[in-house]
């Protein structure tokens, strides 16, 4: 979430040679996990998938106010797999990747709440491809 706020607050952020404020294009938002996959389950039974979806919806609203077209890959607690699928997780990931390839967004943000055994590990993580 901090990364998203940072990107939204910068007028000169560079992305593929253009500033995101010039483009005002499509941004896909992937709220990690969902359906049968809860992700990390925290103290008190809070599920990562629920936190991710809430953050994704808030981020979509903020992006739309800035003039972007924000599309949620997952809009509710359902996974992206068929009920009869033998490997739901694989099908879910394949459908997420297919949507990204088909839509060709300006940016895709995948939201997760990672957990580590080492309590000293904290803060945001950002993964990206370097072209």
Can you annotate each of these PLM segments?
Residues 1-8:
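Hydrophobic membrane-insertion alpha-helices, especially the h-region
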Residues 11-27, 33-131:
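Catalytic-core regions of hydrolytic enzymes
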């Amino acid at each position: 979430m901090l990364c998203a706020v940072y990107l939204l607050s910068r007028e000169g952020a560079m992305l593929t040679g253009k500033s995101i404020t010039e483009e005002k294009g499509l941004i896909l938002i992937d709220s990690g996990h969902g359906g049968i996959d809860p992700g990390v389950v925290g103290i008190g039974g809070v599920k990562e998938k629920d936190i991710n979806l809430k953050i994704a919806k808030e981020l979509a609203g903020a992006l739309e106010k800035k003039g972007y077209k924000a599309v949620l890959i997952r809009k509710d607690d359902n996974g992206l797999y068929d009920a009869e699928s033998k490997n739901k997780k694989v099908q879910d990931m394949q459908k997420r990747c297919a949507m990204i390839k088909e839509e060709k967004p300006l940016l895709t943000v995948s939201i997760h709440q990672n957990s580590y055994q080492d309590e000293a590990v904290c803060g945001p993580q950002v993964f990206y491809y370097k072209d």
